[in-house]
Amino acid sequence: KNDQQLRQIQLKPNYLLVDSPGCTYCIRRGLLNLSKKYWKSEYPHDALLWRMGLMSNGVYAYTDDLIRWRNHKKSAFAKESKKLKSVGAKKEWIRISSKFNDESMQKLIKHDIDGDTSYQQKVIDKNSNWLSKRMKFYKTGNLLRGVALLSSINCYPRLRQYLGDWYLICLKK
């Protein structure tokens, strides 16, 4: 909806989903400097900035067409969507996301976010639990572990990724 309004993006349980491509970001220098403490080479830098912004209640969207949609065959999004179609690649994404969630975001809210961070902690804990259960499903292929993931369905970046887990584990082998 392009009504030319500035709206705050709220932190949600599926905060690992990055809603906007990095080429559209406007970033405070302070956040960029702070990100240097938390960035690791395996983390996409735009995802780090998006997630740090969410944790600090500092992500806003201006609803207007500012750039034309660009679809690059070599973009991070295109590479990730092709790359994550195997069990091994998915396990690696879960491992990196777990490390990011449990280390970087945990440190961020403890040391660099002012005020009450109980909601942020709840989101991090919920994602930690979800990623752990998801990894166990991938490692064991146990169907009951897959069903147990329904309790964390709102952590999935997209609902179709839950179905994709089942496809990779049960059908694609």
For every predicted segment, state its role.
Residues 114-173:
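Membrane-interface aromatic/basic loop that binds lipid-linked glycans or pyrophosphate carriers
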Residues 44-53, 84-86, 100-108, 121-143:
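Short flexible/disordered coil segments
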Residues 2-83:
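Conserved nucleotide-sugar donor-binding catalytic segment
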Residues 3-5, 10, 69-73, 78-115:
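Catalytic core of nucleotide-sugar-dependent glycosyltransferases
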Residues 3-6, 36, 41-44, 102-128, ...:
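Short, structured coil/loop segments at alpha-helix boundaries
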